Swiss-Prot record:
PROSITE patterns from the UniProt entry: WW_DOMAIN_1, WW_DOMAIN_2, ZF_MATRIN
Chain spans, region Interaction with SNRNP200: 355-373
Gene3D superfamilies assigned to the protein according to its UniProt record, in alphabetical order: 2.20.70.10, Classic Zinc Finger
SMART domains according to UniProt: WW (SM00456), ZnF_U1 (SM00451)
Protein name: WW domain-binding protein 4
Region of interest called Disordered, as start-end residue ranges on this chain: 91-126, 188-328
Domain-related comment: The WW domain recognizes the proline, glycine and methionine-rich (PGM) motif present in the splicing factors, as well as the Arg/Gly-rich-flanked Pro-rich domains found in several WW domain-binding proteins.
UniProt keyword annotations, A-Z: Metal-binding, mRNA processing, mRNA splicing, Nucleus, Phosphoprotein, Repeat, Spliceosome, Zinc, Zinc-finger
Gene: Wbp4
Ranges of compositional bias, category Basic and acidic residues: 188-197, 205-270
Cystine pairings recorded for this chain: none
Keyword Protein biosynthesis assigned: no
Gene Ontology CC, one term: nuclear speck
Localization per record: Nucleus; Nucleus speckle
């Protein structure tokens, strides 16, 4: 049988990031070591610090949400004061938010809630009448969620229901998300409650607000002859109470534009009674809308003066003169030449002769030669 080599099993330590032999004595010896114990203690402290940081972040987020709710309630109170209405809502005390996990509803509970919701909607009726902030009546469909200005067929007056005080109020957060606020308990949540009834303070779509001009005038003229004085008083009371539930957190200028829009269109629709007076009247200049960034200003370029300015630039005449003077002022250098008449006379009277270097044995002296001893 052939011999073969089998490797010893090894184990990786996650704390020390090293490999050790996978047997009981080696593992116990490594775990009893000082370095391993220090690494384990360091890892535990890191996990503890991370959990503390996470708890601090959650506590900070809960405080920020509580501050947002308080600011929303404060803005709501200011809007009511600006509109001259009294609020029956008392400012709720902000309690620290605890991180509690709500039990998830079972399927049976959800089915029961849906059945109760359907029964409530069937008992209330399909259409509900509401009043906007401007005092205009609109109709809301509980089944489809659609709203319209025209009175639906077979609708019976439901002003008493809209005039009743609602518990839940719909609002918009700073990010544009809708949430629901309980006026009695001060609770707020993102999901739509079961007993929520839409009111005039709810946010309408821009398409519904554009249908205001003509349909409202026709419906008012037709309903004014049929309705009695008592119904008008009830409608006024209902509009006054529903105005209390209006919450406007973003783009407050939109409400003023919506109010100005119908008034301008009414002035256009009214016939001209005295044409002579209108000709005499001067056209009114439209009011300039205030811009937070300021108004545009036209920049006018000033005509540059054509006065000659002395830039003190060098003239060409001076350059020509300087070049001519430089050419004339050049000095020629004369070099002296020295000639050697003779190389000298030796003592014997024989002229010196240049001798060639002798080469030993036909080899030059600058090359290293092997000596005799070598």
């Amino acid at each position: 049988m052939a011999d073969y080599w089998k490797s010893q099993p090894k184990k990786f330590c996650d704390y020390c990031k090293c490999w050790i032999a996978d047997n009981r004595p080696s593992v116990e010896f490594h775990e009893r070591g000082k370095n391993h114990k220090e690494n384990v203690a360091r890892k535990i402290s890191e996990i503890k610090q991370k959990s503390l940081d996470k708890a601090k972040e959650e506590e900070k987020a809960s405080k920020e949400f509580a501050a947002m709710e308080a600011a929303a309630l404060k803005a709501y109170q200011e809007d009511l004061k600006r509109l001259g209405l009294q609020s029956d809502i008392s400012e709720p005390t902000i309690s620290p938010v605890t991180n509690t996990v709500q039990p998830t509803p079972t399927a049976n509970q959800q089915k029961e809630k849906k059945k109760k919701k359907k029964k409530k909607e069937a008992s209330k009726g399909r259409w509900v009448e509401g009043v906007t902030a401007d005092g205009h009546c609109y109709y809301y469909d509980l089944v489809t969620g659609a709203s319209q200005w025209e009175k639906p067929e077979g609708f019976q007056g439901n002003l008493k229901k809209t005039a009743a005080k609602a518990i839940w109020v719909e609002g918009l957060s700073e990010d544009g998300y809708t949430y629901y606020y309980n006026t009695e308990t001060g609770e707020s949540k993102w999901e739509k409650p079961d007993d929520f009834i839409p009111h005039g303070g709810d946010v309408l779509s821009s398409k519904d607000s554009e249908k205001l001009p003509d349909t409202l005038e026709d419906s008012k003229s037709s309903d004014s002859h049929s309705d009695s004085d008592d119904e008008q008083k009830k409608a006024g009371e209902a509009s006054a109470e529903t105005k209390k539930l209006i919450i406007k957190f973003k783009e407050k200028n939109k409400s003023t534009e919506k109010r100005i829009g119908p008034e301008i269109q009414k002035e256009k629709t009214t016939p001209k009674q005295n044409p002579s007076n209108t000709n005499e009247e001067k056209p009114k200049t439209p009011k300039k809308s205030t811009n937070p960034y300021g108004e545009w200003q036209e920049i006018k370029q000033e005509a540059e003066s054509q006065e000659e300015v002395d830039l003190e630039l060098p003239s060409t005449e001076n350059e020509c003169l300087s070049s001519s003077e430089a050419g004339a002022g050049e000095i020629k250098v004369v070099f002296k030449e020295k000639t050697v008449s003779s190389l000298g006379v030796a003592a014997d009277g024989v002229a010196p002769v240049f001798k060639k270097r002798r080469i030993e044995n036909g080899k030059s002296r600058n090359l290293r030669q092997r000596g005799e001893d070598e």
